Amino acid sequence: MKLIVKVFPEITIKSPPVRKRFIRQLAKNIRTVLRDLDPELAVTGVWDNLEVETAVEKPRLLREMIERLCCTPGIAHFLEVHEYPLGDLDDILEKCKRHYAGQLPGKIFAVRCKRAGRHPFTSMEVERYVGGCLRQQCGAAGVSLSAPEVEVRMEIRDQRLFVVHRQHDSIGGYPLGALEQTLVLMSGGFDSTVAAFQTMRRGLMTHFCFFNLGGRAHELGVMEVAHYLWQKYGSSQRVLFVSVPFEEVVGEILGKVDNSQMGVILKRMMLRAATRVAERLKIDALVTGEAISQVSSQTLPNLSVIDSATDMLVLRPLIASHKQDIIDTATRIGTAEFARHMPEYCGVISVNPTTRARRDRIDYEERQFDMAILERALERAHLVPIDRVIDELGEEICVEEVREALAGQIVLDIRHPEAVEDGPLELPGIEVRALPFYALNNRFKELDSNRQYLLYCDKGVMSRLHAHHLLSEGHANVRVYRPA
């Protein structure tokens, strides 16, 4: 299979040195993202597009390659093409007929030709000649340049002809690794996951920072969604997952701060801590999922007071977004189900939270706060590469993996229902039940405790996370199913 990758249009208007650097970075990222599917993958080209060529023929692997490229920052879209040596107009016609003749009978069509290099014909001459012949020879109903039912597309580059088979849209943005780094404050809900996606999509390397307010299940859930975002949209670069224990900070706020000011002061403490983490990692900016007036702490006066806790740039990609638009984006990128079923721990609840915080009042309340507690939280912050979050769950609990399911065991397919529908797990003689990851923790206690359950997912990441959580809750009848 051969692909022609079209880069994000904003890359093409950069100066030549910057443009080349960005495209080289994109080529490197593509190799990294696809190398486990094809170690011999070839990625060439350095100027306006890239050519990707693979000898892989298995449909499942090809579909996975296409899916990954559709989620790779820096790519506007890419074309599946058939390549031929360039001949004369009659030869071009024959190659187009080979791929499009079966699609044209009774259809309105158009021919689109893009050309680069020196040739004895123009792009328009190719379109007119090929279009006229196809209409006569293939039973087409007619030609429409403005509203065709079928587009016959080709690209001519020097002495090569590419007949386009299919186009796939990607997410645009700049290649990860070409721009600066950010640290996103993650709660695992709709807002923070979409904010993280927005910065990753734009091309900013995005590290994850979670403030643990006291819930182990919440921490595991945020680990899971952070790993999902990285694996789907950012796996070309290694980033960190940072967990900061904030239980003592919450306790100090509850005991020392006036009820109405708690929410704003908690956010200020988080920004202070995140700033210290970012400075330690030489990260350039913080990212939050706040939107104007979505909750009481997000009014303009409150955001201004919150931001005064740090000198670091705070990016808010969702600042003018409507909640439904955020939810729709989360659904599209695959984080909505994580967010809907994210375990929560709310340790700071203001009965009458202020919507117009005053700096002098906040300063007074913070003078009651023992800042040594914040320092202790930072000393206990745990940093781990995002691809190793599973290994860092704790050595005290061993998650057993099995390669084969035995009679009497039940395999729980915890993948998203759409993934189950696209590729159902079938094991002869073994009972397989679909139980989505987002419902597993609540519904597992309803299952027969005398049976053995094997958790299954495509990568083994979610299954290990949930097996670890269930084992830590005392369910000893859980293992992970990882077929060879």
From Swiss-Prot:
**Known pathway:** Cofactor biosynthesis; thiamine diphosphate biosynthesis
Q: Which residues form the active site?
A: C457 (cysteine persulfide intermediate)
Asked whether the keyword Chaperone is assigned, the reply is: no
- Which residues of the sequence carry a binding annotation for ATP? L185, M186, K267, G289, Q298
The disulfide bonds in this chain are C346-C457
THUMP domain mapped to chain residues:
63-167
Cellular compartments per GO CC = cytosol
Q: Where is the Rhodanese domain?
A: 405-483
- Coarse class of the protein's main subcellular location: cytoplasm
> What SMART domains does its record include?
THUMP
- Say which enzyme class the record assigns: transferase
Extract the Pfam families matched here: Rhodanese, ThiI, ThiI_fer, THUMP
Q: Where in the cell does this protein reside?
A: Cytoplasm
Q: What is its EC number?
A: 2.8.1.4
UniProt similarity note: Belongs to the ThiI family.
Annotated PANTHER family? TRNA SULFURTRANSFERASE
* Designated name of the protein: tRNA sulfurtransferase
Which organism encodes this protein? Answer: Azotobacter vinelandii (strain DJ / ATCC BAA-1303)
